Amino acid sequence: MKKIKFYCVTNKLINFIKFEEYNLAWVGKNNSPTGYIRCDYNDNIFYKEKNYSELTFHYWYWKNLLSLEKDDQWIGFCQKRRYWIKNNTKDSINKENINKYLLTNLSDEQNKFDSLICDSIKISGAKNIKLLKRGWRNILKEPRILFNDKYQNIKVHFDMHHGYGNLEKAIKLLDKDDRDDFYEYVKVNNYFNPHIMFISKKKIIKRWFETLFPWLERCEKEFGFKTLNGYDTTRIYAYLSERFLSYWFKKYTNYKEHPWRFLDV
């Protein structure tokens, strides 16, 4: 069994996790509670938290803490409402019983992989009225979206919920090694691995962040900050990262999907 060092990103007090493997990382506007890791000093993007969400801490971790980790240490990221849980968990999970089910280490079998990413979610199957309301421009180009779930892919879903054409604009700003492959990925898949959560080791995490954040900086020149508003686009940089993570870890690592649960806190 291999222990995992977790970083749980939150803007609310979390007082129900009992395991020392879980380090609480603060991204809230108020002063951080005692014992929480702050990410508003040294090399940081704390002023972008509104638009970057949990990536605010991820960036700080990359710049200030990752180099201090041991090469063979398993490192995981979660967030205040979403947690990794043990395999084969069937019970309903709440604050009172979550410590019984929280993932704290990897089995010998899981240790053979390079990374763990969240079990995927399917994003096709929207009702036709919603497709017509939010996806009409996509339907004009591909009418089969209305009749076949296969065509309700990641790109269509992003266009509907986070601004038509925004994902394609962002993909054009990727390095050539990923540009075509990621575009193909979002066109042929109608599921992705959500929440910008992963478990891996130092070498891969470093490579991931070295790819992700320079791309997001280029995206900032396209989308900026002032015009981002509402659910659709305020956190567009997090939404882009969420889709890109699914593609990147599958392309560059020997990955395994793992269960997670939403916790209403």
Residue ranges and their predicted role:
Residues 1-265:
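ER/Golgi luminal nucleotide-sugar-dependent glycosyltransferases, focusing on the catalytic module
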